[in-house]
């Protein structure tokens, strides 16, 4: 009988406690619910504005060129990331080389001539020739418009 007495004793407080807790929790939740969304929402908006950085990528342009060359072929996000890194790397090398050339010639400005020479130095053979011709064409188009 001692075991039978213990079970109802355990069940009765368990039944009373959940009935009391939801009522207390229901009373507290709307108050907390009203206060909490306002503060984190305001803080969340500020954090989003602060943490949002303008990360410049070439993904749009890579995709446009891909569609010009092969309209039926797609590209995975990993491959796009690799292409973006590749372009950043090449541009960094070209900028560094053209900067060195300007310093060697004791000139404060990097002109299209320094860029063209840097392209010839950084890129190999045929690729350099094609890059120079495309660059010249782009500069001509830009200056004429």
Swiss-Prot record:
Transmembrane segments: none annotated. The keyword DNA-binding applies. There is a cross-link at residue 141 (Glycyl lysine isopeptide (Lys-Gly) (interchain with G-Cter in ubiquitin)). Residues 1-15 have a biased composition (Basic and acidic residues). Residues 16-25 have a biased composition (Low complexity). The modification N6-methyllysine is found at residue 3. It is found in: Nucleus; Chromosome. The modification N6-acetyllysine is found at residues 6, 11, 16, 28, 34-35. The modification N6,N6-dimethyllysine is found at residue 12. Core component of nucleosome. Nucleosomes wrap and compact DNA into chromatin, limiting DNA accessibility to the cellular machineries which require DNA as a template. Histones thereby play a central role in transcription regulation, DNA repair, DNA replication and chromosomal stability. DNA accessibility is regulated via a complex set of post-translational modifications of histones, also called histone code, and nucleosome remodeling. The nucleosome is a histone octamer containing two molecules each of H2A, H2B, H3 and H4 assembled in one H3-H4 heterotetramer and two H2A-H2B heterodimers. The octamer wraps approximately 147 bp of DNA. Interacts with ORTH2. This is Histone H2B.10. It comes from Arabidopsis thaliana (Mouse-ear cress).
